[in-house]
Amino acid sequence: EVKKMVIDLLPSFTSPVILDADALNALEGKPEKLLSLKVPAIITPHAREWGRLFGPLPTKIEDVISVVKEKASQYKVTIVLKGVPTCIASSKGEVYLVGKANSGLAKGGSGDVLAGIILALLAQGLSTLEAALLGTWIHAEAGEHARKRLGSFSMLPSDVIDSLSSVFMNKKDL
């Protein structure tokens, strides 16, 4: 029922959209449904979500970059493949890596924070690629602030949110 609802909603979006978590899981084995989107879109899978959508990732980073670039172009979306490094690819073939490692971000809810940051940037008029790049960087910086304050083991996604102001106040970061 949820899978059908997600698939049925895709062509009705009128503003740029982010698909994460259960929206991606609803497309399991049906990535061609992404082509029904009529607006710019960002998908933000981690490795397991990627596997359900597209199949397993290669092991070598250069092969990961290649396949992410290929899928972004094929399905006309911006992809933020979460991991270390996070691989961001546009539908036009541009690929970027954000390499900050922080095990404190590998927790449930952290991807929701990332999606929220990216969505806020999209709402301000940034392109999907700009929002994905800047949002991923802001998320990593806020995660680093939280890690320094609390340690990676004890930090929570809410601590990343609390650290956003530190990132924005430090003008040299932006």
List where the protein language model places each region.
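Short, well-structured alpha-helical segments that form the helix of a local strand-helix-strand
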Residues: 64-73, 128-142, 157-165
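Glycine-rich phosphate/dinucleotide-binding loop and adjoining beta-alpha-beta core of small-molecule
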Residues: 1-100, 173
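Charged C-terminal helix
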Residues: 143-174
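Hydrophobic, well-ordered secondary-structure elements that form the walls
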Residues: 20, 112, 131
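Interfacial segments of multi-pass membrane proteins
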Residues: 118-123, 139-140
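Short glycine/threonine-rich catalytic loop with a Thr-x-Gly-x-Asp
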Residues: 101-118, 128, 153
